[in-house]
Design a protein with these regions (language model features):
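DNA-contacting surface of Y-family translesion DNA polymerases
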Residues: 1-108
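Acidic, metal-coordinating catalytic segment for phosphate/diphosphate chemistry
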Residues: 75, 83-193
C-alpha cells in the first residue's frame, strides 16, 4: 500500500493508549490524597476507553515530583498491572491502578503529578480464560458501566466512586482557565453600548 491517496492505505485510526494525568494545584504528601487522585484518573480513563468501545488488559500508574523544585528530592516511578481478562469496567481499572500505586508510592516526597494509562486494547471483552481459572468476567458489568456513563453524560462528576473523595484540596488550579466561548453560555463576551 502507498500513501499517495489510494484506498488501500492502512491507517491506525483506533486508540492504542488512553492516558489521564494532571498536575496538582497543591503538592501531595499524603498517600490517601494520592489514592483519591489515582481513583479519579482511573475513572476518567475508563470512561474514555468505553467511549472508544475498547477493552484493556494493562493499567499503568505513575507519580512524579517536580524536577525543577530546588532543595527537594526528585522521584518519578511507574508500575504496570496486567489484567487477567480484558475489561472496560471502572471497578477493575480502579483496583488495578490502586495496586500499581502501592508499588510506586514512597513517603517523604512532595508529588506534583500523577496519572493512569490504559493499554493493550482489544475491541471486545472476549478472552479465552484458562480451564482452571477462578477469575470470571463480572456479571452485568456492561449494563452498569453504560448506566454510569448515561448518568454522567449531562455533566462530569454526577456519579462517582467513593475512593475519589468529595472535595480534594489537590485539584488543579483553575483561576487561569481560558473561557469556553463556544460551549458555555456564561463565558460569552457581552458587548455594551
Amino acid at each position: 500500500p502507498s500513501a499517495k491517496g489510494d484506498d488501500k492505505f492502512i491507517t491506525t485510526d483506533y486508540l492504542q493508549q488512553c492516558l489521564c494525568s494532571r498536575s496538582f494545584g497543591e503538592r501531595i504528601t499524603d498517600k490517601d490524597a494520592m489514592h483519591q487522585a489515582v481513583v479519579q484518573y482511573a475513572e476518567r480513563a475508563a470512561e474514555k476507553l468505553r467511549g472508544e468501545r475498547q477493552y484493556c488488559r494493562q493499567v499503568t500508574t505513575f507519580v512524579r515530583t517536580s524536577p525543577f523544585a530546588v532543595k527537594e528530592p526528585c522521584y518519578s516511578n511507574a508500575a504496570v498491572e496486567k489484567l487477567p481478562l480484558p475489561t472496560q469496567d471502572s471497578r477493575d481499572i480502579i483496583a488495578a491502578a490502586c495496586r500499581a500505586l502501592n508499588h510506586v508510592w514512597r513517603e517523604g516526597y512532595r508529588y506534583m503529578k500523577a496519572g493512569v494509562m490504559l493499554a493493550d486494547f482489544t475491541p471486545s471483552g472476549i478472552a479465552q480464560p484458562g480451564l482452571f481459572d477462578e477469575i470470571q468476567p463480572r456479571k452485568n458489568s456492561e449494563k452498569l458501566m453504560k448506566t454510569l456513563d448515561e448518568l454522567n453524560q449531562s455533566g462530569k462528576g454526577k456519579v462517582w466512586f467513593a475512593g475519589r473523595g468529595t472535595a480534594p484540596e489537590w485539584q488543579m488550579k483553575r483561576e487561569m482557565l481560558s473561557p469556553a466561548y463556544t460551549t458555555r453560555w456564561t463565558d460569552l463576551p457581552v458587548a455594551q453600548l
